[in-house]
Every structure is written in structure tokens, then in C-alpha cells.
């Protein structure tokens, strides 16, 4: 399998339509849930999923970095469809899951330009989670 690096790419025509799996729209926030990340052509954000000792079907802590400098955790709004997908991934005993990441329904988002975000998922032993699937690719 390949290393799973889930990319979040904003409004790229190549990723339309986003209403079909495995694509979801999400709104990305940092710090307090009312503090919105400013997205522009000069931003360079990436996020790493931090393994949790135990997790149910809710996402695990993730941290966001800008130019390798940690900012804070990521927050998303809930979306049943995405929670189900995360639950399916959690059925894999080697997947750590997520505990603070949920997605907002795509129809609630404005049509804005976003920068590219990269997520890396890790196994419980700290190694990169691998799969042959692009199952959880997310589109802002």
C-alpha cells in the first residue's frame, strides 16, 4: 500500500463534483472555534494526526503547522456522512482514528479560494498508516 496523505484542495475543478465519495467539503478553524484560518496564496499549512491511545468513532487530536511552526489543534463541524467514514476506518485495528476532527456539510460553505492542506494518518505504533484506498480525501 501507499502512505496515506489526505489532501484538502480548495475548489479545484479536477476535484468536482465534491458531492460524491470520497470527497467532502470542510471548513477549517484554529484556536478557538470562532477563529478562522486565513487562507491565501502565500499560506503554507499542513496537519499531522497525532496517535491517541484509544478512540471511538470520533476523530483524534490533530495539530496544524505553518512553515513547520505549530499553531494549534484543528476543529471541524460535524457531518454524519464523514463520521460514518471515519467509523469504517476505525474498524481497521491499526488505525488510530481522530478525536477532534469532524467535517461541516458542504452546502454550508461559501465559494472561497483555499490553500492546500495535507493530512498524514498514523498507526498506533507511530508509523504512517498505509492503504491502497483514497477513501478519505477531503475537498474544501
Q: What residue ranges belong to the model's regions?
A:
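Non-catalytic macromolecular-recognition regions in eukaryotic signaling proteins
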Residues: 1-140
Amino acid at each position: 500500500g501507499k502512505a496515506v496523505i489526505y489532501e484538502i484542495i480548495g475548489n479545484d475543478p479536477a476535484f468536482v463534483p465534491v458531492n460524491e465519495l470520497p470527497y467532502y467539503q470542510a471548513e477549517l478553524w484554529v484556536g478557538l472555534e470562532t477563529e478562522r484560518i486565513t487562507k491565501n496564496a502565500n499560506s503554507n499549512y499542513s496537519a499531522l494526526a497525532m496517535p491517541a491511545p484509544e478512540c471511538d468513532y470520533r476523530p483524534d487530536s490533530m495539530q496544524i503547522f505553518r512553515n513547520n511552526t505549530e499553531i494549534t489543534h484543528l476543529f471541524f463541524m460535524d457531518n454524519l456522512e464523514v463520521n460514518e467514514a471515519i467509523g469504517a476506518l476505525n474498524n481497521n485495528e491499526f488505525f488510530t482514528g481522530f478525536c477532534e476532527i469532524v467535517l461541516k456539510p458542504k452546502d454550508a460553505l461559501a465559494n472561497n479560494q483555499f490553500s492546500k492542506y495535507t493530512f498524514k494518518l498514523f498507526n498506533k505504533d507511530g508509523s504512517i498508516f498505509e492503504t491502497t484506498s483514497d477513501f478519505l480525501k477531503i475537498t474544501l
